[in-house]
Swiss-Prot record:
One GO-annotated biological process of the protein: response to arsenic-containing substance
Chain residues forming the annotated DNA-binding region: 32-51
Cited function: Transcriptional repressor for the ars operon. ArsR is a trans-acting regulatory protein which controls its own expression. The repressive effect of ArsR is alleviated by oxyions of +III oxidation state of arsenic, antimony, and bismuth, as well as arsenate (As(V)).
Record organism: Staphylococcus aureus
Domain HTH arsR-type span(s) in chain numbering: 1-92
Native organism taxonomy: Bacteria, Bacillati, Bacillota, Bacilli, Bacillales
One GO MF term: DNA binding
Entry keywords, A to Z: Arsenical resistance, DNA-binding, Plasmid, Repressor, Transcription, Transcription regulation
Record keyword Repressor present: yes
Name of the protein in its database record: Arsenical resistance operon repressor
Disulfide bond sites: none
Length: 104
């Protein structure tokens, strides 16, 4: 995952409603109507948040009749965590390896 991709995803996650949606989905697959019951916003607002989460692959979706079902994409969440851990530690991939300390 590139810095640009990680930055985009972190911007998506900076919205408290989206974080709460992900937390609700951590319990398992839910339909839009179940998610909507938890929030005090309209269906179009939920659709806006879900589109952002789905477009950025944080959530997967399937349609069953007239219902939309949503599920966490655990693989991408694991990838995000792994990339943040890389930033948090010195390792072979770290860009700091290309910077010479004190050679200003």
């Amino acid at each position: 995952m590139s810095y640009k991709e990680l930055s985009t995803i972190l911007k998506i996650l900076s919205d408290s409603s989206r974080l709460e949606i992900l937390d609700l989905l951590s319990c398992g697959e839910l339909c839009a109507c179940d998610l909507l019951e938890h929030f005090q916003f309209s269906q179009p607002t939920l659709s806006h948040h879900m589109k952002s989460l789905v477009d950025n692959e944080l959530v997967t979706t399937r349609k069953d009749g007239n219902k939309h079902w949503y599920q966490l994409n655990h693989a991408i969440l694991d990838d995000i965590i792994q990339n943040l851990n890389i930033i948090n530690t010195s390792n072979q991939r770290c860009v700091c390896k290309n910077v010479k300390s004190g050679d200003c």
